[in-house]
Amino acid sequence: MTIVEGMGANSVHSPASRPVEVRGTLVLALLGAWTIVVPYLAVPLGFEVKVASLVEVVDHVVPGAFVVTAGLYLTRLARRRSLAGAQSALLAGGVCFLAGFWVLSTHEPLLADAARSANVSWAAAIWHFSTALPVVVLSLWFVLRSSAADPAP
């Protein structure tokens, strides 16, 4: 048996063998961090939305923390093995998807408010909504990727 034949799903590979997965997981973790800081950078940038600070924690900090944690876990996993067929990657990707969907769904009314009134500017609405779609799309890619069969023999 050669070294290549012995490489299974749990083999340790260099990050260079799966650069797209590793980079994608790092981007996901960075998007989670960005989700956390969005409402706090909104104030100096003039994109503030008048809501209670608890609302910002629930709508940004909590889901962002889930995405950062799961994204870093996925990064660690992707550096060790392919995410294809990894049940823990499916779970982590699902957590990120749900967190991103939470941000998406809680900010849809903000976009609707910006469309129908002058209470909220479009810039503020888009700023607060900015991480939702990228997190949902990227985490869905990881869910689909991890639910695929492992290509290794």
Model-identified regions with their sequence ranges:
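Hydrophobic cores of alpha-helical transmembrane segments in multi-pass inner/ER membrane proteins
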Residues: T2, V61-L72, H128-V143
